[in-house]
Amino acid sequence: MTAIQLIVGLGNPGPEYEQTRHNAGALFVERLASAQRVSLTADKKYFGLTAKFSHQGNDVRLLIPTTYMNRSGQSVAALANFFRIKPEAILVAHDELDLPPGVAKLKRGGGHGGHNGLRDIIAQLGNQNDFHRLRLGIGHPGDAKLVSNFVLGRAPRAEQEKLDASIDFALGVMPDVLAGDFAKAMRELHCQKA
């Protein structure tokens, strides 16, 4: 079992994107930083906001890229390469169109599923896709032509409450994730639904 050394929250920078569906991953990392009582600070070297905490004697780094979504890999690769963090020790939290609001799922490896942030991370890590993902359901607008406006839009209150609940569920399994016990974390998380 590989312990997680880097947790990345995907989103777009700037106040106009803060509360959008596409920033679900960044919201997760902000909440995790708060729970760990650490502050995210800008670090130009890694093109993002970073923080560090210790879990069972291991350093865990948090990262929210301040690049736009489609350049997230630049930030992830800069930090992972500097600290020699292998893809299997990385967890990327991101919005997931294929899951309804209120559902969060863990997954290891796989393709990008059309997600530009994941696409760039895979490319910047040398086409290695063996990192873990925390998929935070945001639902789908029903028509592929509506996806861009949908992900860049703000969720109605009921949807946002479900997303917040799924983030709470995910935070609850983080001790198992950080220890590398993904099987236990998946069993617990995949039974939850807001």
UniProtKB/Swiss-Prot annotation:
Coiled coil: none annotated. GO terms for molecular function: peptidyl-tRNA hydrolase activity; tRNA binding. One of its GO terms (biological process) is protein quality control for misfolded or incompletely synthesized proteins. The active site is at 22 (proton acceptor). It is found in: Cytoplasm. Its main location: cytoplasm. It is an enzyme of class 3 (hydrolase). GO terms for cellular component: cytoplasm. Its EC number is 3.1.1.29. Keywords: Cytoplasm, Hydrolase, RNA-binding, tRNA-binding. It catalyses: an N-acyl-L-alpha-aminoacyl-tRNA + H2O = an N-acyl-L-amino acid + a tRNA + H(+). It holds the Pfam family Pept_tRNA_hydro. Transmembrane segments: none annotated. SUPFAM superfamilies: Peptidyl-tRNA hydrolase-like. The record marks 12 as: Discriminates between blocked and unblocked aminoacyl-tRNA. TRNA binds at residues 17, 68, 70, 116. Monomer. Hydrolyzes ribosome-free peptidyl-tRNAs (with 1 or more amino acids incorporated), which drop off the ribosome during protein synthesis, or as a result of ribosome stalling. Catalyzes the release of premature peptidyl moieties from peptidyl-tRNA molecules trapped in stalled 50S ribosomal subunits, and thus maintains levels of free tRNAs and 50S ribosomes. Belongs to the PTH family. NCBIfam families: pth (TIGR00447). This is Peptidyl-tRNA hydrolase. The gene is pth.
